[in-house]
Curated annotation (Swiss-Prot):
One GO BP annotation of this record: translation
Pfam name, any one: Ribosomal_L18p
Primary gene name: rplR
GO molecular function, one term: 5S rRNA binding
Record's protein name: Large ribosomal subunit protein uL18
Quaternary structure, from the entry: Part of the 50S ribosomal subunit; part of the 5S rRNA/L5/L18/L25 subcomplex. Contacts the 5S and 23S rRNAs.
Protein family according to the UniProt entry: Belongs to the universal ribosomal protein uL18 family.
Protein keywords: Ribonucleoprotein, Ribosomal protein, RNA-binding, rRNA-binding
Transmembrane feature ranges: none
InterPro entries the UniProt entry points to: Ribosomal_uL18_bac-type (IPR004389), Ribosomal_uL18_bac/euk (IPR005484)
Cited function: This is one of the proteins that bind and probably mediate the attachment of the 5S RNA into the large ribosomal subunit, where it forms part of the central protuberance.
Amino acid sequence: MMNKKDARLRRARQTRAKIAELKVNRLTVFRTNSNIYAQVFSECGTKVLASASTVEAEVRKELEGKGATAAAATVVGKRIAEKAKAAGVETVAFDRAGFRFHGRVKALADAAREAGLKF
């Protein structure tokens, strides 16, 4: 019998396989109860080009310690878009890592789009 984590990881594997066929940079999101993380991987999937999370000192200062909210995800989305553009990445494929496209994951994606990242 499959538990929630195994089901999420199965969905993530399917998504990552489809993205790997496209040969594009991948924006991946990881969500915990207390933080949210975002990374942009290279086309081959082995090199991290940019990363942002609510663990970073600048983000923590801006959020006053509240790292598990949609507002925090919005800040991380803007930062990942800025860092990706600085690394020369304009277009990515969005990898939600099996999480539902809702709440914090959606807030991060919308903020990254508004900041100029295309996906």
